[in-house]
A protein has these predicted regions:
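Acidic, metal/cofactor-coordinating or nucleic-acid-engaging core segments within structured domains
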Residues: 197-203
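Conserved blade-register residue in beta-propeller folds
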Residues: 21, 169-171
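Nucleotide/phosphate-binding catalytic cleft detector across ATP-hydrolyzing
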Residues: 1-159, 176-191, 203, 210-307
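Ser/Thr-glycine-rich phosphate-binding loops at phosphate-binding pockets of nucleotides
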Residues: 162-168
Length: 307
């Protein structure tokens, strides 16, 4: 979060697996109810309804404006950032993004979605917030993570942003983005999770909670039966090989270009693929894209002129 002339720029990375801001990350899940729930740890109250944030897992949707979920999750993200500074009333400028291949077509609708209410009052974690959303910008997902450093890129480079639902790919040449070489593949981490679940059921008649699988992908082990972990590792290794196959389909050549990997899926390559650290750079900061959105909004001075 950045304070620009009394306006707080808050970057929100609306992932399919997690919502990220510059300083926090929580599961992309929300359950709504007309009645107050028993457990209230991450409870958001808005317009008379109760929303449990981080509960369940939102299904993949091609357009994030199809329901109210991402709007409610945005309010929670705003509150999480403001609470760090003990702020409950603020003018907020939202900096968000969409997958590379979709941003041109969906930018306007998503911007209007985020701006649907200029004044918003809600309660989160028992704190009442009064927010004025003074503007919003929507940027290319993935590129935002390298925006602060792209001017230092030389030669030919490829960016691979592996999220939960999608994988975004773009090429740069001498720090300039090649607009003809931007791609979005529906081949995010969730595809690896599904492959692992299938392998465990097929080979061991075993079911494992998704969170345990995500922990395995992140840390390389979860301390369960050796045979189960072996099957999980084989499925994860197969997924990473397919990631590089898709990169090659879009022109990746390790002899010519460096590869920059961002997003939560970077840990899969780190744990399950033989990485050449001289040619492949993995950014482990899951909040890098949200930070990039804030950087881009600040550089473009979008919030500075808003009254």
């Amino acid at each position: 979060m950045k304070n620009k002339n009394g306006i707080y720029i808050i970057g929100v990375d609306h992932g399919y697996g997690n919502i990220k801001t510059a300083n926090c990350c929580f599961t992309t899940g929300v359950e709504s109810s007309d009645t107050e729930p028993t457990f209230k740890n991450d409870l958001l109250i808005y317009q008379g309804r109760y929303y449990q944030i981080g509960v369940g897992h939102k299904e993949y949707v091609a357009e994030k404006v199809m329901d109210e979920d991402y709007y409610i999750l945005t309010l929670a993200a705003i509150a999480r950032e403001l609470s760090r500074e003990q702020i409950a009333q603020a003018n907020v400028f939202l900096a968000a993004g969409l997958p590379l291949s979709w941003v041109a077509k969906q930018r306007k609708a998503f911007q209007e979605y985020l701006l649907q209410n200029s004044a918003v009052e809600f309660t989160f974690r028992r704190i009442e917030y009064r927010i004025r959303i003074v503007g919003a910008a929507v940027y290319p997902q993935g590129f935002a993570a390298i925006a602060p450093i792209v001017n230092h890129f030389t030669g030919s480079n490829m960016l691979c942003d592996i999220g939960n639902g999608t994988m975004n790919i773009l090429r740069t040449s001498d720090s300039k983005v090649d607009l003809r070489q931007m791609f979005t593949e529906k081949y995010g981490v969730q595809q690896c999770v599904l492959a692992i679940q299938e392998a465990l059921m097929r080979e061991h008649h075993a079911e494992l909670e998704e969170q345990m699988i995500h922990n395995f992908l992140r840390y390389g082990t979860v301390g369960i039966d050796e045979g189960l972990e072996k099957a999980m590792k084989l499925a994860a290794c197969d997924y990473t090989k397919k990631v590089f196959r898709k990169l090659r389909e879009h022109g990746y050549d390790p002899r010519i270009m460096k590869l920059y990997v961002v997003g939560g899926g970077g840990c899969l390559l780190k744990n399950f693929f033989p990485i050449d650290p001289g040619r492949i750079v993995i950014n482990n900061d899951i909040c890098a894209t949200a930070k990039g959105y804030e950087y881009m909004a600040e550089v473009q001075n979008l919030a500075g002129g808003v009254k």
